[in-house]
């Protein structure tokens, strides 16, 4: 498209098209034909299926684009931190803890998905950049303000790493890992408690052992239980887009048992002023995890849907998942060593028991 080099200027270089057509007709045997725009688009995307979906970039990265962008919009309203999950690893708790920090500002809540925007991994992406920006408050000239977003479905989204990097190449990425077996069981119990008919009609063991000839609804639930726990596979996808120095891999078990220590380490990674979370978090024996300390020295905990106590996983499922994740856990351990990151205790335990 010859007009692309003029994007942001005041002309489309139509004369260039005319000159090319005249040259081809005069000096070549190429036969030119025309077609309606929709037919041309279909032919183009048959040749370039990788371009079928848009890939949003930051308009402020190019001075020409910035000049034609609305003056009512801000270049600093995009997040600099992404909490990517996966689901059922403690991402909502981390979101809450991060929002306590005076430097960090979360996205505004979505009317349908609450604190998660889920922009990069579903049809919200097709709503465009303006839709995304509307969930972030302007900085109001405060250069110390850092925006962040949390969507736990980002971790294992096939298109997410590339889309995120195209728009937020300098962002810092936070992933939370717990035992993949516990994560799978927690997800099953989570949707079961929300009345999911598949989870209510099939046992956990039936779900995780379903083969590819099983009904689609059963295979879909199996995949949502098992696939996000293949941690090394998805981390490699993120590492293909982002530098390892931009990715923080957080131990979800420690986040639950020693949140203040985890937040201290995380603050160093984010390079933000230190905040003593020992004074902000207190263990609540009724909930079974740490909660925010309020001004009257009481605790403010997450909602009833968080921290539920489920029946223990049955022994048959435990053994199956231990075998199932052995290869993936081994790959994760090697990846962490390669990156110079600590191997969490839960991973050491699972490998020794495998």
Question: Which role does the model predict for each range below?
Answer:
Residues 37-152, 167, 171, 181-202, ...:
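PAPS-dependent sulfotransferase catalytic core
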Residues 13, 20, 92-101, 160-169, ...:
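PAPS/PAP-binding and catalytic site of the sulfotransferase fold
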Residues 5-9, 92, 155-158, 180-186, ...:
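Short catalytic/ligand-binding loop motif for oxyanion handling, primarily in non-cytosolic enzymes
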Residues 40-45, 236, 240-327, 342-354:
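The conserved 3'-phosphoadenosine-5'-phosphosulfate
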